[in-house]
């Protein structure tokens, strides 16, 4: 019984911790959303809009699609990191986010890009 109680307490603690940490760096009203420049991405991938959309509908991830186009994962991550950093810089300069939020978001860029390029909601 004690083990179950400790496990439940630990699970509750972890749930609370994870729910709290994802927004703890953001002050009220601060939101940063990365917006993909679709035309620039298609140019980088050397792809047409139809080819890209059809591939995504088939459940292929962006990393797999880029690989078929001869672009390795590191280049793809670097491309998105530069794009996101540029948008973060603009948001900081416009006052949409503060320096603390900017500094808190930077370390997670590569990890979030990695998750994104390896995810496709249409995959089986």
Task: Pin down the residues of each PLM region.
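Mature extracytoplasmic/periplasmic regions of secreted or cell-envelope proteins
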Residues: 3-14, 18-124
């Amino acid at each position: 019984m004690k083990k179950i109680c400790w496990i439940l307490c630990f699970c509750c603690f972890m749930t609370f911790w994870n729910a709290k940490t994802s927004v703890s760096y953001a002050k009220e009203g601060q939101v940063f959303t990365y917006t993909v420049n679709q035309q620039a991405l298609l140019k980088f991938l050397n792809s047409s809009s139809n080819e890209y959309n059809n591939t995504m509908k088939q459940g292929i991830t962006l990393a797999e699609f880029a690989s078929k186009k001869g672009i390795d994962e590191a280049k793809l991550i670097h491309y998105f990191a530069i794009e996101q950093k540029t948008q973060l810089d603009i948001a900081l300069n416009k006052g949409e986010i503060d320096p603390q939020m900017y500094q808190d978001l930077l370390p997670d860029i590569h990890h979030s890009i990695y998750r994104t390029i390896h995810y496709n909601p249409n995959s089986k």
